Design a protein with these regions (language model features):
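Conserved, mostly hydrophobic/aromatic
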Residues: 45, 68, 125, 153, ...
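N-terminal beta1-alpha1-beta2 module of alpha/beta enzyme domains
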Residues: 1-71
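Hydrophobic faces of well-ordered beta-strands that scaffold small-molecule active sites
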Residues: 6-10, 41-43, 77-79, 109-115, ...
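Short, acidic/polar
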Residues: 20-33, 92-93, 115-123, 232-239
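Internal, glycine-rich beta/alpha segment that forms the wall or movable "lid"
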Residues: 1-4, 79, 85-133, 144-147, ...
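Glycine-rich, proline-tolerant flexible connector loops at the mouths of alpha/beta enzymes
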Residues: 40-64, 83-87, 137-142, 250-261
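Active-site mouth loops of central-metabolism enzymes
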Residues: 10-24, 81-89, 108-117, 221-229
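An alpha-helical appendage that flanks or caps ligand/catalytic pockets
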Residues: 2, 94, 98-103, 142-246, ...
C-alpha cells in the first residue's frame, strides 16, 4: 500500500512570470499552506552548472527556496533538477545543497531528476539513488513514457544494489478547479494565453489558438484539468493506472487564473481531491 502525497511545484516557466513582481514573488504560495493538507513544496530548475568552479545556484533560486521554507516544514521541501545533466552530477548536487545550506534557512531534503520523454533522467536517478520527477507526465508523449521510465529507474537501482521506491517518484499534473467546469474555464481566461507559446513549442497544442480553444485543447488531450474535483480525481486515477503507483502528485503553481481564484482552486483541491484519496487510499504493486 502506497500513501499518495500531494504538493505544489514551481517551475522555471512560472518563476519567469514572477520575476520583477514583488507582490507575486511573495504570494505565489499558500499563506495557510500547513492547514490545507499539502505535504510538499518543490522548486524545479537547472541548478547544476556544466563546468566545475561555477556556482550551482542560479541567482534567483535563493529567494524562491527561502519563500518555500517559510511555508513548509523542512522535511517537505524538494528540488527537481532539470536536464542537461553533467557527468559529475553527484558532486554538482552536493555543491548545490552545500550552497543552499549556507544561503537559506533549511536545505531541501528531497532531490529528484526531472524527466519528460528521454530515458536519461530515469537512468541517472536510478544509478545515483535520486528521486524521479516526471514533469511531463500529462503530455501525450510523457504519459506514454511513464511505464518505461519506471522500468528503467527500477532496473538501474537494482543493478546498483538497491530496490527502487515508488514513494520517490513524483508526477506533475496541471490543474485548476472550481465548482463547475464553466467557472474553471472562465477563471483561467485571465492568464492562460501567456502559456500558449510554450505549450505549442512542447507540441501539446497548435500555435496561435484563441484562449478558449487553447483551454479546450489542453482538456481534450488530457494535459490539464480545468474543471471540477471529479475531473481531477479521474485524471489522478488515470495516472495511477498508467504507472502502477507513484509517491507524489504535484500541482504547478502557475498564473492561469488570478491570485484569489488560484488560492480557491488549491483549497477546493484540498477539501475534495486530497480528502478523497486520503479516505480511500491508493495502492501500488
Amino acid at each position: 500500500m502506497l500513501n499518495l502525497k500531494f504538493g505544489l511545484i514551481v517551475t522555471p516557466t512560472d518563476n519567469e512570470q514572477r520575476r520583477g513582481d514583488p507582490e507575486s514573488q511573495e504570494n505565489w504560495v499558500l499563506p495557510d499552506f500547513p492547514l490545507l493538507n499539502y505535504e510538499a513544496l518543490w522548486f524545479a530548475d537547472s541548478f547544476v552548472m556544466p563546468t566545475t568552479g561555477e556556482s550551482a545556484v542560479n541567482p534567483h533560486v535563493r529567494d524562491i527556496v527561502n519563500a518555500i521554507v517559510r511555508h513548509a516544514q523542512p522535511s517537505n521541501i524538494g528540488l527537481g533538477i532539470l536536464p542537461p545533466f553533467t557527468k559529475n552530477i553527484r558532486s554538482g548536487v552536493e555543491q548545490l545543497l552545500s550552497e543552499l545550506q549556507q544561503q537559506v534557512t533549511d536545505k531541501p531534503t528531497a532531490i529528484a531528476l526531472a524527466a519528460q520523454v528521454s530515458p536519461e533522467s530515469a537512468q541517472i536517478a536510478g544509478i545515483h539513488d535520486y528521486g524521479l520527477l516526471s514533469v511531463g507526465a500529462t503530455t501525450p508523449a510523457g504519459f506514454g513514457a511513464l511505464p518505461s521510465h519506471w522500468e528503467i529507474y527500477a532496473r538501474k537501482a537494482k543493478e546498483n544494489g538497491r530496490k527502487a521506491q515508488r514513494d520517490k517518484w513524483a508526477l506533475v499534473a496541471p490543474m485548476h478547479l472550481a465548482e463547475t467546469r464553466e467557472q474553471a474555464m472562465h477563471q483561467v481566461l485571465a492568464g492562460i494565453d501567456q502559456y500558449g507559446p510554450l505549450y505549442a513549442e512542447m507540441g501539446i497544442t497548435p500555435s496561435r489558438l484563441s484562449k478558449e480553444a487553447l483551454i479546450e485543447t489542453l482538456i481534450e488531450n488530457h494535459f490539464a484539468v480545468v474543471g471540477t474535483p471529479d475531473d481531477a480525481i479521474e485524471q489522478i486515477n488515470r495516472l495511477l493506472a498508467q504507472t502502477g503507483g507513484f509517491g507524489k502528485l504535484l500541482l504547478p503553481a502557475n498564473h492561469w487564473a488570478n491570485a484569489r481564484d488560484t488560492l480557491q482552486s488549491y483549497a477546493l483541491f484540498s477539501r475534495t481531491v486530497i480528502a478523497h484519496f486520503k479516505s480511500t487510499g491508493s495502492s501500488s504493486q
